[in-house]
Amino acid sequence: MKVLLTGANGYIGRRLKQTLLDEDVSLRLLVRNPKSLDSDLNTEIVQGDTFDMDALELALQGVDVAYYLIHSLQDKNYKELDKKSAQNFLDAAIKQGVKRIIYLGGLGIKEEASEHLLSRIETGEILSNNPGKIETIWIRAGVIIGSGSASFEIIRHLTEKLPIMVTPKWVKTLAQPIGVDDVIAYGLDVLS
């Protein structure tokens, strides 16, 4: 089975890459900066991103399953970039005959979502928009907890500096955290 992993330099992508290398798959990575990856003889690397259609189509060529772990949060126009990225990916995946997209998105209700979470939901909707031509599996996770994750480090820092904290009455955010190892396991479970 030929698998494409996008977002291989990210928090989840780095861990998923290591797990996929232990599986019986042919692994290809689409990355902007190949120099930032650990060299591995068992992976094929395509340099590019979802805005470079030639590189994107090359990366998806011959692929059975593609992991979509892309998010443009660093850019102030991230909502529009996320939408364009997802649409480009979906179009190229269909054109190249990919059978399945696996997307890791956020957990929440669209009507109550923050702008950031709404962007993640809209990305999932775009990737799921053509079920007759491609299967999309949408894993929706809350706060991902694990050593090195932004959420984990914020919580760890707060508990070290402020072991007891009084919060205002309006602080009522509910969260459903999930361990990073569980996210990776679910991502692997839906591979085949």
Regions found by a protein language model. Give the residues of each.
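N-terminal Rossmann NAD(P)H-binding glycine-rich loop of SDR-like oxidoreductase domains
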Residues: 3-25
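SDR active-site strand-loop-helix element
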Residues: 6, 30, 69, 101-106, ...
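Conserved glycine-rich Rossmann-like NAD(P)H-binding loop of the short-chain dehydrogenase/reductase
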Residues: 25-32
